[in-house]
């Protein structure tokens, strides 16, 4: 396993200053590929036994990937036999051919045991093979939600990762230099389970986070030099009215304290409702998300005004599906006269002027470069930087 340098001397430097950080954040937001889980979609459709966890702390199953055809349930159980607390295993097979799909699940007696196995085995060599374990939680976010109550942390983006880099390898690379590292996450493709070439490292100490951004930039993790950058934070700072001073007055919806609906224009034809939920959901609780069939626009309604303002301020002008999206205030569906935009009526012919409620704002909202630097508490909320 590749070890990090004994010291960070000679590491590549990144420019300092808030302007540079903001530019890097803009790059992050231009690739809105939110990963609420690092395992293939199939893992969310399968639960060992009758498990139906009500919360992340109830999840006691792990996803295991990169399985070869000969790796069956007996092999998986034997691998984890020394833990003494694996209760069952399942390899997912093609219904027509009976061949392994390359992944499966292991259930343990408790969440704490599963978590210990994940931390111990992930990235370690698999017995009788020349490959390493690829493990993750069997439910999206199961290993992330608990971090939200552990106090503040500070996160960096790590790009240009080699395909073989695992959570363990990435974490170990930084832990050998910085004692406050709390964990690392390599983002995987949902369909293939393979690395997307970037990830995140979490620190307990902000000073070490800032040092790592400079000292580790250009250092090697496995076979490639890393590209380090900031990770946008939606929770690190409280909402500040100054953030939105330049978005006020864009249209009537902005002046309505009860309006939490955002119009999303310029959508790529391939963008789905679920993609909008994934992207806009990072800023707060969503009530409704709708893309009219055959239209290049959509609507997102939040549970509160602050979340809507935050999303509008950050996401306006960012890239989604190859297109720059343009945001403005929509009309509140709480008003009976505005129900049509959700029921399939009024929003098919939205007027181009902002005063119509569906049009684009005359000027994109000015974004405060000081408001979003830091790290999300859950890895799933991060975005990839532009390569």
Curated annotation (Swiss-Prot):
Official protein name in the record: Polyadenylate-binding protein RBP45A
Pfam families assigned: RRM_1
Function, as annotated: Heterogeneous nuclear ribonucleoprotein (hnRNP)-protein binding the poly(A) tail of mRNA and probably involved in some steps of pre-mRNA maturation.
Tissues in which the protein is found: Mostly expressed in seedlings, and, to a lower extent, in leaves, stems, and flowers. Present in immature anther tissues (tapetum cells) and mature pollen grains.
Superkingdom of the organism of origin: Eukaryota
Residue stretches in coiled coil: none
One Gene Ontology CC term in the entry: nucleus
SMART domains (alphabetical): RRM
Subunit structure: Interacts with the poly(A) tail of mRNA in nucleus.
Biased composition regions of type Polar residues, renumbered to the chain: 329-342
Chain positions covered by the region annotation Disordered: 329-387
GO molecular function, one term: mRNA binding
UniProt cross-references to InterPro entries, sorted A to Z: Nucleotide-bd_a/b_plait_sf, RBD_domain_sf, RBM42_RBP45_47-like, RRM_dom
Main location: nucleus
UniProt family annotation: Belongs to the polyadenylate-binding RBP45 family.
Induction data: By ozone-induced oxidative stress.
Record's keyword terms, sorted: mRNA processing, Nucleus, Repeat, RNA-binding
Residues covered by the RRM domain: 60-140, 154-233, 260-332
Annotated source species: Arabidopsis thaliana (Mouse-ear cress)
Annotated S-S bridges: none
GO biological process, one term: mRNA processing
UniProt subcellular location: Nucleus
């Amino acid at each position: 396993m590749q070890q990090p340098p004994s010291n960070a001397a000679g590491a590549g430097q990144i420019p300092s200053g808030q302007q540079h950080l903001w530019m890097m954040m803009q790059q992050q937001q231009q690739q809105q590929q939110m990963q609420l889980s690092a395992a293939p979609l199939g893992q969310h459709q399968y639960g060992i036994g009758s498990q139906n966890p009500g919360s992340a702390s109830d999840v006691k199953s792990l996803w295991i990937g990169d399985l070869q055809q000969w790796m069956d349930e007996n092999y998986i159980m034997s691998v984890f036999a020394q833990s003494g607390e694996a209760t069952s295993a399942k390899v997912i097979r093609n219904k027509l051919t009976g061949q392994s799909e390359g992944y499966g699940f292991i259930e343990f007696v408790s969440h704490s045991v599963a978590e210990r196995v994940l931390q111990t085995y992930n990235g370690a060599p698999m017995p009788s093979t020349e490959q390493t374990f690829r493990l993750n939680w069997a439910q999206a976010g199961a290993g992330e939600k608990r971090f939200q109550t552990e106090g503040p942390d500070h996160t960096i983006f790590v790009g240009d990762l080699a395909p073989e880099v695992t959570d363990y390898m990435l974490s170990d690379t930084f832990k050998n230099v910085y004692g406050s590292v709390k964990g690392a996450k390599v983002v995987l493709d949902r369909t293939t389970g393979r690395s997307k070439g970037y990830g995140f490292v979490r620190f307990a100490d902000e000073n070490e986070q800032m040092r790592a951004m400079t000292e580790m930039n250009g250092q090697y993790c496995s076979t490639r030099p890393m590209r380090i950058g900031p990770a946008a934070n939606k929770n690190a700072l409280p909402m500040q009215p100054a953030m939105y001073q330049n978005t006020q007055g864009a249209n009537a919806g902005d002046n309505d304290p009860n309006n939490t609906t955002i119009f999303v224009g310029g959508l790529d034809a391939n963008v789905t409702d679920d993609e909008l939920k994934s992207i806009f959901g990072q800023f707060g609780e969503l009530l409704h998300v709708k893309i009219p069939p055959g239209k290049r626009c959509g609507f997102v309604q939040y549970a509160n005004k602050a979340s809507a303002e935050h999303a509008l301020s950050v996401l306006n002008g960012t890239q989604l599906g190859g297109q720059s999206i343009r945001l403005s205030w929509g009309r509140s569906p709480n008003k009976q006269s505005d129900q049509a935009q959700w029921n399939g009526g009024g929003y098919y012919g939205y007027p181009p002027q902002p005063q119509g409620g569906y049009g684009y704002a005359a000027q994109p909202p000015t974004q405060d470069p000081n408001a979003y630097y830091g790290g999300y508490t859950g890895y799933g909320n991060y975005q990839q930087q532009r390569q």
